[in-house]
Amino acid sequence: MKIEQIQLVQFRNHKNLSYGPAEGINLLYGPNGSGKTSVLEGIHYCALTKGFVTAYDSECLAFGESFFLINGRFISDALKEDGVKVVYSRDNGKKLTVNGQDLTSFSQHIGSIPCITFSPAEMSVINGSPVERRRFLDNAICQADCRYLQSMLNYRRVLLQRNALLLQLKERVQSIEMLNVLTEQLSEYAADIVFARLRFLDEILPGLKAILSSVSVKEEPRITYRSSLVPSVYALTKEELINYFREQYAKKKQDEIARGLTAGGPHRDDIVFFLNQHEIKKYASQGQQRSFLIAMKMALYGYFSDKLNEKPVCLFDDLFSELDRSRVEVLFALLASFGQVFITATEKMHGPAVTTINIPEAI
């Protein structure tokens, strides 16, 4: 996948920016506040219909403006051209148009433009709460597997219905028969999600090991899935996992009714990262944590390429901060074999297949 043109109108500090990126590595450099990250975020909107810096569309409005517009023109590895337009206004919300057609469901666009991000804030995937790691899993798998996205949407819908019913049962205003129906549905969707997550972790690990060995000293990474309901998910078939969910929900039924809340499931699960058998969150240095996350993000490149037969667009914000020159050179060499890559930095840097673009202040 390649971006041929991106236009940002009244988007953050860009009143009207039009930019035609080069192939290979695009290094956007300039002082803090010049709008480098905003260019990456605009591309991210075209790919995933949202930003990666902020969760609120309104925060992307230029100061004093009531709407923003993003236009992107993309060409796939199979030479298929796509035009993507994102418009947001305070009055009418967000609208997504692809090749002239308005999309009523943003989820149907996910995966069309595979995208990988890195930003310093994403260190929370390593050292933050479980919700950050679940978000990492879901964002990656949803782009590569539309069935997973549908399972997630179905799971969330049934979970909301089940929680609402548990509250009604707590107040004794509903029959328990409907709870059995929703529990059966939830168990099946939960098993689909857990199995897809396990498959993803298994498939990404070889790439993670290879890249980590290039950017760091020889260290052995491992990722363990930690279920909120199942002691060990690894030895179970999908049918066995469905049955286990059924049994756990049956055991916890009275407690769930008393609390008015579903006890556990994929929405409460976690993953644990290890280096040389030591949990990274507890024992690794900040540099080791950063190298691990960078390697894991870069491993997504091979994962998406294999799954989608499409090279993903890479958006790496402030990638090189806190890295010494030798590691920067290694990363440049690795990224030179990728497709189109965007990196932000405060200073001009050189490397193989690098095109530098100066983003002056207040464009």
UniProtKB/Swiss-Prot annotation:
Cellular-component GO terms for this entry: cytoplasm
UniProtKB keywords: ATP-binding, Cytoplasm, DNA damage, DNA repair, DNA replication, DNA-binding, Nucleotide-binding, SOS response
Transmembrane segments: none
Subcellular location: Cytoplasm
UniProt GO molecular function: ATP binding; ATP hydrolysis activity; single-stranded DNA binding
Top-level taxon of the source organism: Bacteria
Xref: InterPro entries: DNA-binding_RecF (IPR001238), P-loop_NTPase (IPR027417), Rad50/SbcC_AAA (IPR038729), RecF_2 (IPR042174)
One GO BP: DNA synthesis involved in DNA repair
Binding-site positions, ATP: G30, P31, N32, G33, S34, G35, K36, T37
Keyword DNA damage carried by entry: yes
Record-stated family: Belongs to the RecF family.
Function text: The RecF protein is involved in DNA metabolism; it is required for DNA replication and normal SOS inducibility. RecF binds preferentially to single-stranded, linear DNA. It also seems to bind ATP.
Official protein name in the record: DNA replication and repair protein RecF
Naturally occurring in which organism (per UniProt): Chlorobium limicola (strain DSM 245 / NBRC 103803 / 6330)
